[in-house]
Amino acid sequence: MIMKTVKSFALAAPLAFVTLAPAAAQEFSKELIEKGRYLATASDCVACHTNHDGGKPMAGGLSMASPVGTIMSTNITPSKQFGIGSYSEAQFADAVRKGVRGDGANLYPAMPYVSYSNMTDEDIHALYAYFMQGVEPVDEKAPETKLPFPMNIRASMMGWNLLFRPNEVHKDDPNQSAEWNRGKYLAEGAAHCSTCHTPRGVFMQEQKSLNLTGGQIGAWYAPDITNDPVHGIGSWTQAELVTYLKTGKLENKAQAAGSMAEAVSYSFQHLTDADLNAIATYVRSVPSANAAETTGATRFDKGAAGNEMAAFRGGKYAEGMAGDHAGAQIFAANCASCHGTSAQGTKDGYYPSLFHNAATAGDNSVNVISAILNGVDRHTENEHVFMPPFGDQTNAVVQLNNVEVASLSNYLLAQYGNDKLTVTPEDVQVIREGGPKSNMVQMARIGMGAGVTAVVLLLASVIWYRSRRKTKPTLSA
């Protein structure tokens, strides 16, 4: 028994020392580094850890709006001073899969370690090799995240992790095909689809019972991508979903914008056809938990060509007003030159039709508002798709106010999409500020206040009880 233990230790010790050794002491093969590069691409690391305004790859500095405040992405280059260059492989694995930094501090789940927790040891090893020896070190400090109290106390994430962080590495389902299993591994892990497409609970945790049924992600809404034929993408073919992942567009159906445009630009278009097909196979098998009616027109079939120009041609322009035709006038002045006077788009699909379009016919108006305010910027191998923003940005062609955006949104919805929706200027302001805010900060403050009050009352009770015992008269015989 003792000899078996000694032999086991002798075999395991070298691996343990390799895991704990700094990367500089190891030499990784080109094949392993390339595998890690591919996995990092599938994980979309560069999209979040690079400032898109001239930043260096993986050096951090990207500002990301979240329901609890602005989060800054970190430097994950192998810089020993400002990045992760001094991380052992074990520390790297803990950061990726457990959300714990090399110094022991907790990461915020804006880093999708909840999804990455399913990644295998072999893939973590490949990622480590790539980040240590395949990424150029950048010796620049990224701006720090400064969330409001008490979210700025990173130790608070320990309790969140105990409740909501999975601890199981992916295991293949023997009842499913190899392609399905590969697709699930990528979709639920590296590609972290549920991070955006699954709604969040009170504590900002993914509601797994509503997996992939749609969720708010900053100023955008990641729609239902289950196999629901009406609310999801159950009407899409395998080839259509693969095309969308690779190009970011599907004519007369959908166009990628916001975080999805980034995912296409930096990740999906660079994956192999085999992996894209695997992801599509798995995603198209995910059942819907949406309680809404599953019959009727899909969000890809609503609306028709048309315009209201005859109603106001020759009249006074209604910019800044909320008149009956204000939305149509704003559309004619700012949108029709690209999308067409009847919103039919262009024949090559570069400028999409605004009817038979998921953005205008979705279950909510978020993406209509956000597309107007933030525009679209998507890079693929064959083209650069760009729609200028109409919000507060310096590159906005025209800066529309909330009333104007609401008027334009309502015109687009009524004329070309989901005419059951109505947008108010207040709705526009929410999206302008980066999306709905969570009451989690206030709840945490109230909870901490209640806890402190309870402790104070308990201490006061103890002191009062002890003082009574000391002052209580002693009875003598």
Region annotations inferred by a language model:
Residues I2-L32, I71-T74, A95, V100-D103, ...:
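Post-cleavage N-terminal segment of exported redox proteins
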Residues K30-N51, G55, A59-A65, M157-N161, ...:
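Sequence/structural segment immediately N-terminal to covalent heme-attachment motifs in c-type
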Residues Y38-T50, T74-N75, A90-K98, P109-P112, ...:
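C-type cytochrome heme c attachment motif
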Residues S43-D44, H49-H52, K80, V96-G104, ...:
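Sec/Tat-exported extracytoplasmic proteins
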Residues T50-N51, K56-L62, G104-L107, V138-T145, ...:
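Short, solvent-exposed loop/turn and secondary-structure capping segments
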Residues M58, M72-S86, R97-E122, P143-L147, ...:
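Axial heme c-ligation environment in periplasmic c-type cytochrome domains
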Residues M58-A65, G69, P199-G248:
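Active-site substrate-binding loop specific to GH73 endo-beta-N-acetylglucosaminidase modules
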Residues K437-G447:
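Short, low-complexity patches enriched in S/T/P/G
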